[in-house]
Amino acid sequence: MSQNNYPKLHNATWPGIVGKGPDSEPIISFDDMLQYTAAAEVNGVKFDGIDIGLFDPHIDLDMSDDGIKILAEKVQKLNLNIGSLVAPIWGGPAMGSKEDRALFVEMVRKSCVFGQKLKDLGVRPYGIVRIDSASSVENWAKDPINNTKLIA
C-alpha cells in the first residue's frame, strides 16, 4: 500500500516534551519532531500530519497571528497537516474552584481560536481540540456525580 486514505495518520509532538527535561532525557525540539515525522515511512506509508500540544516549549498559545502563519507554513512545507490540538488545561482543573474552572474554559476557548486560525491558513482541514479534566481520579471519586457535572 503506497498511500493511506483513512484513518489519517498523525504523529503527536508532545512526547518530545512530556517526561523530558533537566532530570531526564532532553526535550526534542518541535522542528526536530516535524523533521522526524516528515521522514518516517513504513512500507511506503507516511504520516499525513501532526497533532500538537499547545504548550511550551513547543508552542506558545499566545503567539501572534504572524507566528501562527509561520507555524502553518513550516508544517505545510513538509507536506503535513495539523490535526488534533491539546489544550493546556493544567492551569485550572475542571473540578477546581470557580477561578480554576474559568481558567480551564479560557484555555479551551483560546485553543479553539488557535485551531480556527490554523484552519483558515489551510494547514488544519480536520481535527479536534483534546481536553482533559486536569483532575485526579481520586478527587473525582470523592463525589462522582457532582464532579462529573463539573467536568461536563
Please provide the spans of the model-predicted regions.
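N-terminal pre-domain/capping segments
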Residues: 1-125, 139-142, 149-150
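Active-site-proximal beta-alpha loop/turn segments in soluble metabolic enzymes
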Residues: 130-139
